[in-house]
Amino acid sequence: MKEKLKELQELALSKIEAVKTSSELEEIRVKFLGKKGELTTILRGMGNLSPEERPIVGKLVNEAKAAVEEKLESVLKAIKDKEKAEKLAGETIDISLPGRKKVIGKRHPLDLTLQSMEEIFVSMGFTIEDGPEVEYDHYNFEALNIPKDHPARSEQDTLYINDNIVLRTQTSPIQVRTMENQKPPIKMISPGKVYRSDSVDATHSPIFYQMEGLVIDKGVTFADLKGTLELFAKKMFGDKVQTKFRPHHFPFTEPSAEMDATCFVCGGEGCRVCKGSGWIELLGCGMVHPNVLRNCGLDPEVYSGFAFGFGVDRMVMLKYGIDDIRLLYESDMRFLNQF
């Protein structure tokens, strides 16, 4: 048995020495040390030996295994080092070649439009206010004169965290918080993301951007609202743009209106974008409802104000002639590189 083990060990070592690849080395390992390997088989047959022979043979087998394993590790390391060196040699970089130019990013059309809108209002004396996107029901609905049974509160329109907390459906809660924390005069805008329970299609998204504005002071009138928004439209879309106001209803303003502007595509002549009317709806607006003022601790007999709100995504689509809102969120560089 001793001679047989010595022969097996020498055979294994000689075969290991002759291999060229790691796959050949693995075959040898399996042949001698695998579950059915020759050295493993001898170990399993130890039960057939006499009590005197077992410790002697066991020691010899373990010594042979240790020698083979050590050789396997040594040769495997040499093979891997050689393969690594060959790979590195094949990947040699010519350092004299010109480098790649850095790709310079561009501003997203949403960001460009939002910045333009903010700059216009800041130039008119407005401040920019911010607030939480996860909002209390009180700020999103109650304080804005939206009663419990109002359709906007349904789960079809609003994303609820629990009974008292929602993902804000508008940036109007920022106006409420501002009126609670600042004394008039107030002149502010509140841009940011809002959330609705909408399915994604060409004109709807569950997440989009809104900008709302608020002016509160003594003696503020609807004429101030019209003058402010008409000036904004001309600065945003050019001096030739015309505007008109239509009566509408919002629970947080009274009276309420929607402002239209002459179509940016056809100049008011009528086209596919404006559906032949020559006009495009831009925003909703109105005088702040007395109940909203009271909810914020302001006396409607002393103070008045106006509010307005834009869908920023819609403004982007109108400004650049984009007919699918999904393009703004798909990160398609072919689309974004146009701006």
UniProtKB/Swiss-Prot annotation:
Binds 2 magnesium ions per tetramer. Belongs to the class-II aminoacyl-tRNA synthetase family. Phe-tRNA synthetase alpha subunit type 1 subfamily. Mg(2+) binds at E254. Its main location: cytoplasm. GO terms for molecular function: ATP binding; catalytic activity, acting on a protein; magnesium ion binding; phenylalanine-tRNA ligase activity; transferase activity; tRNA binding. It comes from Clostridium beijerinckii (strain ATCC 51743 / NCIMB 8052) (Clostridium acetobutylicum). The keyword Nucleus does not apply. It is found in: Cytoplasm. GO terms for cellular component: cytoplasm. This is Phenylalanine--tRNA ligase alpha subunit. The keyword Cell inner membrane does not apply. Keywords: Aminoacyl-tRNA synthetase, ATP-binding, Cytoplasm, Ligase, Magnesium, Metal-binding, Nucleotide-binding, Protein biosynthesis. NCBIfam families: pheS. InterPro entries: aa-tRNA-synth_II (IPR006195), aa-tRNA-synth_II/BPL/LPL (IPR045864), Phe-tRNA-synth_IIc_asu (IPR004529), Phe-tRNA_ligase_II_N (IPR004188), Phe_tRNA_ligase_alpha1_bac (IPR022911), Phenylalanyl-tRNA_Synthase (IPR002319), tRNA-bd_arm (IPR010978). Its EC number is 6.1.1.20. Tetramer of two alpha and two beta subunits. GO terms for biological process: phenylalanyl-tRNA aminoacylation. HAMAP family: Phe_tRNA_synth_alpha1 (MF_00281). Its cofactor is Mg(2+). It catalyses: tRNA(Phe) + L-phenylalanine + ATP = L-phenylalanyl-tRNA(Phe) + AMP + diphosphate + H(+).
